[in-house]
Amino acid sequence: DITVNVVSPLTVTASAADPLIGTCPTSTTTLNAVALGGELNYTYNWLPATGLDNPSIQTPTAKPAVTTTYTVTVTDNNGCTATATVTVNVAPDLTAVATTDDGTIGTCPTSVAHLDVTASGGEPGYTYLWAPVAGLSDPNSKTPTAKPSATTTYTVTVTDANGCQTTASVVVNVAPVLTVAVSADDYNIGTCPSSDAQLTAIASGGEPGYTYLWSPATGLSDPAIANPVAKPAVTTTYTVLVTDINGCTATSSLTITVAPVLSATATASDPNIGTCPTSQSTLDVIVTGGEPGYTYLWSPSTGLSDPAIKSP
C-alpha cells in the first residue's frame, strides 16, 4: 500500500515591525512573512522590490521613499503558493518652526522670553533639545524660558519617534542696560510765580516704550511725563523712575533749589538836600534772597543820574 499525505493548505501572513517610518536614512522597518502549512522548504518573493534590501528572504529591511504596499509570495516544496500584503507608510518630512513671545528682552531679572517649537510631519512622539543651554530653564522642554545675558541664537533639535531629526532656530536679543539722565533748565528758582524749572529725563538702552514717574509729585505740572515743569515751594530733590517695555527700570535724581524770598532795602546818603546845584544825595539798595544777578529800576526817574543802576 502507498500512503499519500495531504498537507494542510499553505497560508502566509505579512507584517511590518514599524508600519510608519520617516524619510531620514536611519528610519527603516523589517518586514516579516510567516508561512504555515504546505511542505517545507519555503521560498519568498516580495514585490515591489523597490526599497527592499533583499526581496527573496523572509525578513527583508524596507526603506521605501513613499507609502508602499508590499506583496509577498511564498512557494512551498510542492510548488504551491500563498500571498499576503503589508503596507509601510512613509510619514511626511519632519519640520519644525521655533518662535519666541519676545524677541528683545532687558537685563533686569523679570524680563524673559518664552521659546516654543512647533513640529509637524514625521511620527509624533517628539523630543526636544535646545542649544546652547545657557540661560534656559529646561533645554529638553518644548517651551523653555530663556534669560540669556547677551543676544543669543537658540537652536532646537526635534527628534521624532522614528529617530528622524530636524532643527529650527530663533534669536533672543538682549537690549542694552536701561539708563536715564536728568537735567533742568534752571536748578535755582525763586519764590515768585514766574520762576520755575523745566525738568527733562532722557532714557536710553532697554527697549523703547518708556514710561516716566517723577516723585515727589508736589510742585510738578505732570509727574508722568518726561519733561514736567517744577515749581516747588522749598528746595526739593526729584527722582524719576523710568520703565521700559520689558518692565526694566532705572532711576536718576536732581535737586531744584528754591532761593529765599527776594527783599530789598533802599537808603539815601542824605535824606535832606537843598535846592542849590551842589546839594545831592546818593541812593542805594541792599538786596537779599532771590538769585544773584540782580537788575535795578528806580522810579520816578526824574532827577536821577541813571534809574537803572544800583546807586544813582
Residue ranges: model-predicted function:
Residues 24, 77-83, 138, 161-167, ...:
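Short, exposed coil/turn segments at beta-strand boundaries within extracellular/luminal domains
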Residues 19-27, 103-111, 187-195, 271-279:
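Short, solvent-exposed loop/linker segments at the N-terminal edge
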Residues 37-45, 121-129, 205-213, 289-297:
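Solvent-exposed loop segments of extracellular immunoglobulin-like
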Residues 2-8, 86-92, 170-176, 254-260:
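Interdomain boundary/hinge segments at the C-termini of tandem beta-sandwich modules
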Residues 56-69, 140-153, 224-238, 308-312:
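Solvent-exposed segments in extracellular or luminal domains encompassing
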Residues 27-36, 111-120, 194-204, 278-288:
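A short beta-strand segment in extracellular, disulfide-stabilized domains
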